[in-house]
Amino acid sequence: MKRLLLITLAMLSYIINCNAVVVKSPVDYVNPLVGTASKRELSTGNTYPAIALPWAMNFWTAQTGKMGDGWTYVYGADKIRGIKQTHQPSPWINDYGQFAFMPITGKKVFDEEGRASWFSHKAETATPYYYKVYLADYDATVELSPTSRAASVRITYPTTNEAYFLVDAFDKGSSVTILPDKRTIVGYTTKNSGGVPDNFKNYFILRFDHDFVYKGCLSDGKLIDNQLSATCNHAMAVVGFQTKRGEQINVQVASSFISEEQAFRNLKEVEGKSFEQVKAEGKAEWNKVLGRIEVEDDNVDHLRTFYSCLYRSVLFPRSFYEFDAEGKPIHYSPYNGKVLEGYLFTDTGYWDTFRSLFPLLNLIYPSMNEKMQAGLVNAYRESGFLPEWASPGHRDCMVGNNSASVVADAYIKGLRGYDIETLWKAVVHGANAVHPTISSTGRKGFEYYNRLGYVPYNVGINESVARTLEYAYDDWCIYQLGLKLRKSAKELQPFKERAMNYKNVFDKETCLMRGRNADGSFQKPFNPYKWGDAFTEGNSWHYTWSVFHDPSGLAQLMGGYDKFNTMLDSVFNLPPVFDDTYYGFTIHEIREMQIMHMGNYAHGNQPIQHMIYLYDYSGQPWKVQYWIREVMNRLYTAQPDGYCGDEDNGQTSAWYVFSALGFYPVCPGSTQYMIGTPYFHKAKIHLENGKTITICAENNNDDNRYIQLITMDGQPYPHYYLEHDKLKKGVSLNFMMGERKPI
């Protein structure tokens, strides 16, 4: 009877799967507008449509916000001020090296308010490799297809003798020069939001395929006809054409952080290529990268959400290197202002991305992360510290020393080809020092932490419990890396011991993490719903679970797994109450938790994103399967409001990618992934070594979210974790799904 039931289920699964969509061109399922329906008070991603190649040096976006506004593109806007080259990782960090262009017809009105044109999303096309928009006020259409350091632009003008093309180099010091004989505009911008040396510039070049019938420059808002150059606080260049309806002006654009000469060299990425060729090559590159994961499903919306998240997972960290005349990688250093050999990457905050973004790279795109690790070697050599938030240089943002996790996870999972000994020195140094001017780099409060075993609450160092918990985990990562490198027991002993420091801020009375004073007493009064204060963008209910490396030890502190599970349950059962007095207002992360109707679970921010998977450790995997499916169903879509908080440079997207595949790296630095619940009927992960991970979920639908049986390569698999080394060899995982939790 049981065998007959299994055969029947298998036949039903086959019938259902016959309706599954087989994805042939994954980039066609990407919506770059996901997360753009955001504002300062409420984030649905805080993204912009990044028109770019994977890990490109330059991104492009339509600009709806004012110059310098971190919300550069907002879905609810109805006017476009320009098409901007951007390097912005988030609205909170803001942009650097940005400039914009704008087609205009009729009157010579070039300030950003006056030139802004109405547009409609119905006349807008946004893909990762191609952007098109109709500028209604000018009856003109803009198209753009990018490469990593250049782009091909095509403008379709109406019939007019006043077809203008504006280049806005923005304020804070800029320069433009028009070269009529070469049909070219060159210039530079110095605009930035910090993290750069005094000699920072982004040099740009624009080359046209039509002669200029008008030339002019604006110096700080004043237009001078026939002026061919301007160097001032805010420089702009304007060239004009006489066009017939449907006539197209082609522009090739490139830039460099190194020099104008290097910008011309970078222009070779599009030289000699038609617009359609650049567009086709961009699409092919995206399909190559996204196609590393094939998924099949009968729900097209699931496919769109998945590939939109995978797209966000392969944008950052951005390349910050270029190629010299001999084809060797070189970079302008945002740490010391020199042009040096080698790779460099930037625009990521490890507080966010150590959790699942870098583990995703290590599994699916390891050769890219090997370059990133080589870039970290250079960052350390050039600044004396590994970055914790880089954009493009060190930025004072967030807490923790999580570069240690990024370094350890890569090496432990087999990445090679870079100077690991220098990175070892870097992580050890960063664990015992703080940057002299950027307090989030290194470890603020390390003296207290090393001596007392925690960062005290009452010594003037904010977010002390968050720091303690993250330092303890980072010490564990350093210890694991040291074991892999066969460092001496004496050298490793401090890190081994300090990995248990999380216990020093655990309050047995409340079973929660709590601020602790220098004399050993716990902070009073204590409100576990209070955001900030001893924690970073969260409260004690969120941060208590930040013991990635020792969930079993945390459970024992609580009194055992029964209490552990009760505490986990409480996160969802509690009302979404909060105390925002530390900030003096309700920060957007609080509001996002409040409105999602999931109790005190705050998936819109990173500290708690791994928490659901902790049920695997405590013997209740069906709760993982229930809640992971709830999060994927309710908190992610492929719409402009598709995230439940900041997307954060690939982290929140990588969470979805892993979770939809059915497993997740709870503890980067270890070799294990915890099993969740597969979202798709079938998925294939094509590894760089030529092996394939095949994941099949029979009888899978929203009701049948519970795993009844797992087999690996045809044999029953009794565990709720997967080993990295086993996955690298290629495996076939089969999940039999059902509507009831297994007994």
Please place each PLM-identified region on the residue numbering.
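Extracellular attachment/recognition segments
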Residues: 706
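Conserved catalytic core of nucleotide polymerization and phosphodiester-bond processing enzymes
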Residues: 697
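ATP-dependent phospho-/nucleotidyl transfer catalytic cores
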Residues: 474
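Bacterial Sec-dependent N-terminal signal peptides
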Residues: 1-22
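Accessory carbohydrate-recognition regions in carbohydrate-active enzymes
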Residues: 21-358, 362-405, 411-469, 477, ...
